């Protein structure tokens, strides 16, 4: 590098205001001019190439040229001589010399495009296959003709390698090392970088990913100096760092999984269109399942100067008038042919064995059936067509029913506990888990390795618990898995002699661009609405490098919505295959699920679920289940194969709307749909009736019928007009003596004899005689005693009811016995003075209550919670007091409890906001959840924003435990330091002797604690007087 260039770089890095040298400026200007000239030359070559392909493109090019751009600068002055010549020449004929010069110019412009016959020398670590070399040559021809294209080979055919070979060709043959940008899904970032290093190490590839600080450092130290050829980054990074990427003149822009830009109004699509690029390449393994407008959006991104009007494109491909017409097919083929290359595995990769797919139909467990019934009954009015049918409501019902078919523990409160255990209940409460528990040991015994895909990450949580319980070595990847963990787990799974048996992935996050060909079994735990998602998941294993035949097991819960969802997805996939692979457009209306279809999917199997109460899970051997699944899969495949395109288009979900002939209402030549219309209750699903339980246990019946029961002892009579007194009303004890005397005398007058209580054993006779003696010796109340009784009846808390007493006890539990002010507020209908008076008597005489032990236990538990809240508040206060700006400075000592889900930034916010809102607030976790959603720092953090209040509470409890442990350690450390610093002779001899030989006095309990212990002790030794 020259001194001038060095000075320019240093000036840029130091952000100085000094001007760069004239040489650097002119060099930069030359590069800019060269880049602009190439774009203009490509445009010219592009038009020539397309017009030679077919005259169809004249339609678009003519339209794009209707509004020419206004020329810059002054108009060129026409010389008089030329003007006269133009006026005189009306025939516009060429001279022989002019024609010769034009032909010579065309010959010199025509050059032979380079083609590879074998794998290029710059490709290391292996040889490219013949179809991959053909793909490379096709992309080279696009480049030479200034055309951008779509590489749409089926998943697993090596699109990554073909793309790398194209960029290698540009460096080694065209002297264009870059800069190039490759934009890929986050899950495949590291895989792309690894592939660059493996196949073409001469290309210097760098990866832009990470948090703000990491990105800033990377941009300053790596990206801006430009010592690289290819920058690999993710969609999200393009959006966040768009201002940086706009500074570069990109030679090639490559987008993997290009369907992400099929909406031209999306943020990503708009930003990428602003990048300055010479060439663009789109990569997708998914067929073009686009409607007309989405197809235009892709073509507009590739060639904005050709396809610049969506309205013109829509008008030219008017599907309303010519869908299915041969003319439309011819047009579409002609338009797509120059830009699109798609090959299928069956056509080009003969060494890869075809995958074998099998559906395994499972039943519902008893718990699943119960939850399925609850969901249907909750919206039975909608299911029966009686309520307001809204699409969002139907979608929610479908989602809840799908959760039932996966596992009932996906519903909060379904799993038994606490305590929560990992046991057999994980298996026998779900039909799919029961099959999985039989299938996995068989696969492990066969030496297979397994990928399990599910749409629900919480289902992966359950599967993770199951793997822990069964001791299966596993990996897991979902949308929340950090980038570093993704790469590490993929490498661990793909290692030679890897101990990992299972890899659990979410269908959307784990189905894109990941190579897991070391596995040979794919289990689709729950099917996606979009069949292409499931195909992408299967192709993680079914790709180049796979040495075994890939087996795919799709788990389907029989006679539920899931069966219809899979059926619809298969019809959609087959129709797409007929249309798209034939080069035609998909009618977008067939992809939309209307309300009638959703309603009939929900209704499917509902009566069967209601009519049965028991489990459908069988104890059959796994081989028998697989054999039956294989037969049913073949039967359904044959039925679909027999349907033509017209039948597939009119395929219905057994709806009552206008449809074709393939509905199940067509039976034996009659349209039973018409008959059903005559019956107003034709679609009515009868909810299950409440049934009386009949006792059919014969042995138990006869044992009950023949048992000779002992007659119950007659109740002792009481005076008819005796007042009812309650123990919590705290009447004087003398009143109970007078009431007992009145009762005994009444029993004497009626001649009541006390029966022997056999339950008392040997003391029965003694107790009987004592009670009878009291009756025999009873005397009636005197006038003075009757007057005394009346006076005593007015001295108790007669206005206090059982409801008032329960409110008083709950208030003591909530606030503690010492907080009389708040206790008084919670007792409705009583003044503070009345509550204070009652409180004093209650704590003085509470031992007289019949269930004092239960009441005291209730109050003590509440006081324990209060003390716990105070200790937590104290711990949070201590932690926060150590920092001036805790929202930025606070650090947590995790030890071995870091966990993988929450980041330290999230934990810091939880702790600080919990302290700010107030830990002891009633709805603090709902407020915490709202604060997270309102915080700008989490606007892209979908994990923390999607947590429920209960999940936040659990996380905060964990963090509080860590803080308390940290506080204890700091206190112990401070005490130890103080002990070390204390001088040995600072304490007098007498006191030193006392402190060394005499134990420290025990701390005295609080008055309330002392009273509480006395109350319990007294209550345990006293018995309530029986009346």
Swiss-Prot record:
Listed GO MF terms: ATP binding; ATP hydrolysis activity; ATP-dependent activity, acting on DNA; ATP-dependent chromatin remodeler activity; chromatin binding; DNA binding; DNA-binding transcription factor binding; helicase activity
Chain residues that bind ATP: 153-160
GO cellular component terms given for this protein: ACF complex; CHRAC; chromatin; ISWI-type complex; nucleus; NURF complex; polytene chromosome; RSF complex
Quaternary structure and partners: Component of the NURF complex composed of Caf1-55, E(bx), Nurf-38 and Iswi. Component of the chromatin accessibility complex (CHRAC), composed of Chrac-14, Chrac-16, Acf and Iswi. Interacts directly with Chrac-14 and this interaction is further stabilized by associated Chrac-16.
CDD domains: DEXHc_SMARCA1_SMARCA5, SANT, SF2_C_SNF
Domain SANT: start-end pairs: 795-847, 898-962
Keywords, in A-Z order: ATP-binding, Chromatin regulator, Helicase, Hydrolase, Nucleotide-binding, Nucleus, Phosphoprotein, Repeat, Transcription, Transcription regulation
SMART domains given in the database record: DEXDc, HELICc, SANT
Subcellular localization, as worded in the UniProt entry: Nucleus
Basic residues composition bias: residue spans: 69-78
Start and end residues of each stretch annotated as Disordered: 1-39, 61-104, 971-1027
GO biological processes: chromatin organization; chromatin remodeling; DNA replication-dependent chromatin assembly; heterochromatin formation; negative regulation of DNA-templated transcription; nuclear speck organization; nucleosome organization; positive regulation of DNA-templated transcription
Gene name as annotated: Iswi
Residue ranges of every copy of the Helicase C-terminal domain listed in the record: 435-586
Main location: nucleus
Biased composition (Basic and acidic residues): 29-39, 79-89
Phosphoserine: residues bearing it: 67
Role description: Energy-transducing component of the chromatin-remodeling complexes NURF (nucleosome-remodeling factor), ACF (ATP-utilizing chromatin assembly and remodeling factor), and CHRAC (chromatin accessibility complex). NURF catalyzes ATP-dependent nucleosome sliding and facilitates transcription of chromatin. It is required for homeotic gene expression, proper larval blood cell development, normal male X chromosome morphology, ecdysteroid signaling and metamorphosis.
Pfam families named in the record: HAND (PF09110), Helicase_C (PF00271), SLIDE (PF09111), SNF2-rel_dom (PF00176)
InterPro entries: Helicase_ATP-bd, Helicase_C-like, Homeodomain-like_sf, Isw1/2_DEXHc, ISWI_HAND-dom, ISWI_HAND-dom_sf, P-loop_NTPase, SANT/Myb
Protein's name according to its UniProt entry: Chromatin-remodeling complex ATPase chain Iswi
